[in-house]
């Protein structure tokens, strides 16, 4: 190859979420909990879901077909396709293999599926970037699909569900460039959330422990990122420049080097706490900074384990980040607020939300931090620079309009019934879905039937 690829990153983004949703305020009444428990306590407004007419195959077929169509992508220009999901329909056959029917005669496409809770999509992104940087690259682009259907058994966790998929076109000369060599990861063995029972779509989850794991992972991945950044800056080999930081009128701290951030969003309230947590790291690095004049003195020498759940730490830094959060993080949680947790698609839906809610002119030249977490556990912190126009991506995504138009509110009773319907349909063969095709939007793939050999057949809504 004559020259190595430059500005590797995201060239196009497509998103899909089901047309049906339940209002979290209605779910509060239905569940008999206090008003605001889900809407304020979790920071959630709506939750997307689907019945037995849709599954991870249909989600992925829909989002990839729309990516190819809406960006006029030649299927022969794709040399890698990788899927990140934890929604498993088959213990052997990959979702990627199902998607091959969209690529015609182009059978020379690398990649399969990546599985680790909500982290699979991020691993697929890293793999695809690594492929383009490697000697194995053949000059073509790659596609990453991240998607899931998040369902929980009845109880406290059920309102933290959601459903959706994101497809990313990755290649050189991209407008949204991943900063080369600059990421930090944290991997541990933990039983915070896991799915050992293959007869059920529902996970085993320890909610409080999982939040603790998420926070520790954020701390460690961010520290690893900062260490790597310092090394690369010293070596002057990474070629990135610091962001220009959205002006907030507040004293500057290292966190201000990110103009915007996107986080994996189990709940939007956790995202707000996580952004505040990053400022806590800045405080520990430089407690004498004028930015931290109002921080209580006892915070300085607090034991690390205690800091993970300490309300003084949480409240102090959430107060300090309130204004910056609205400017820098809120644009990235609009999808999560209105759709819920899309698992693997969550953080990439956050990036899509950000691109769709910030004017392309204001995004140009900016720096985006991104934190991805998957239970069990795997986590990474990385960053992007916007070096080209995101206008076409924003126009195609049209998320502000999509979140309102063509969506149908369903009462909690119907949502409950549809959860039971999915439970009934799980692992069935010789099965005809009962869900109404009328709820499916045009251009969306849906399940027609499953034969007596478990083979699944789909149609596209006209």
Predicted regions and their residues:
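Condensing-enzyme catalytic core mediating Claisen C-C bond formation in acyl metabolism
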Residues: 1-53, 157-247, 377, 381-462
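Acidic, glycine-rich active-site loops and adjacent beta-strand->loop/helix elements
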Residues: 14-16, 83-90, 116-121, 145-151, ...
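Conserved catalytic cysteine-centered active-site region
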Residues: 37-41, 45-58, 86-141, 281-346
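Cysteine-centered functional microenvironments
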Residues: 109-123, 155-158, 202-210, 257-261, ...
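Flexible, glycine-rich active-site loops centered on histidine and acidic residues
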Residues: 133-168
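A conserved active-site cap/scaffold subdomain adjacent to cofactor or substrate pockets
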Residues: 211-243, 251-258, 262-290, 297-298
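C-terminal catalytic subdomain
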Residues: 302-311, 326-408
């Amino acid at each position: 190859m004559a020259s190595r690829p430059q500005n590797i990153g995201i060239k196009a983004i497509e998103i899909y979420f089901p047309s049906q949703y339940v209002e979290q305020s209605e779910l509060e009444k239905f569940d008999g909990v206090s008003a605001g428990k889900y809407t304020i306590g979790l920071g959630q407004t709506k939750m997307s879901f689907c019945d037995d007419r849709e599954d991870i195959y249909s989600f992925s077929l829909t989002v990839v077909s729309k990516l190819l169509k809406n960006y006029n992508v030649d299927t022969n220009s794709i040399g890698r396709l990788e899927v990140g999901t934890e929604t498993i329909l088959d213990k052997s056959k990959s979702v990627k293999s199902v998607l091959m029917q969209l690529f015609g005669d182009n059978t020379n496409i690398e990649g399969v599926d990546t599985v680790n809770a909500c982290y699979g999509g991020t691993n697929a992104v890293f793999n695809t970037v690594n492929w383009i940087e490697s000697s194995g690259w053949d000059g073509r682009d790659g596609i990453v699909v991240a998607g899931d259907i998040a369902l929980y058994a009845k109880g406290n966790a059920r309102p933290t569900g959601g459903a959706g998929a994101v497809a990313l076109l990755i290649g050189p000369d991209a407008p949204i460039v991943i900063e080369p060599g600059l990421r930090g990861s944290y991997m541990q063995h933990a039983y915070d959330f896991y799915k050992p029972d293959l007869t059920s779509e529902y996970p085993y989850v320890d909610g409080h422990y999982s939040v603790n794991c998420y926070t520790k992972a954020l701390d460690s991945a961010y520290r690893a990122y900062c260490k790597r950044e310092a090394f690369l800056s010293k070596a002057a080999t990474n070629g990135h420049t610091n962001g220009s930081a959205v002006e907030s009128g507040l004293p500057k701290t290292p966190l201000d080097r990110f103009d915007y951030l996107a986080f994996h969003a189990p709940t939007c309230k956790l995202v707000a706490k996580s952004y505040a947590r990053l400022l806590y790291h800045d405080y520990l690095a430089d407690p004498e900074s004028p930015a931290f004049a109002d921080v209580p003195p006892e915070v300085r020498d607090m034991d690390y384990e205690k800091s993970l759940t300490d309300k003084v730490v949480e409240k102090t830094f959430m107060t300090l980040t309130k204004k910056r959060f609205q400017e820098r993080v809120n644009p990235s949680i609009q999808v999560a607020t209105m759709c819920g947790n899309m698992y693997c698609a969550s953080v990439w839906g956050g990036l899509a939300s950000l691109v769709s809610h910030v004017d392309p002119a204001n995004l140009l030249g900016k720096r985006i931090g991104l934190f991805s977490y998957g239970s069990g556990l795997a986590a990474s912190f990385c960053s992007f620079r916007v070096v080209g126009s995101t206008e076409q991506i924003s126009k195609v995504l049209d998320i502000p309009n999509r979140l309102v138009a063509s969506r149908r509110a369903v009462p909690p009773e119907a949502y409950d019934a549809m959860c039971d319907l999915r439970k009934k349909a799980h692992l069935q063969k010789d099965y005809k879905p009962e869900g109404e095709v009328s709820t499916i939007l045009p251009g969306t793939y849906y399940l027609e039937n499953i034969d007596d050999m478990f083979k699944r057949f789909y149609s596209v809504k006209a």
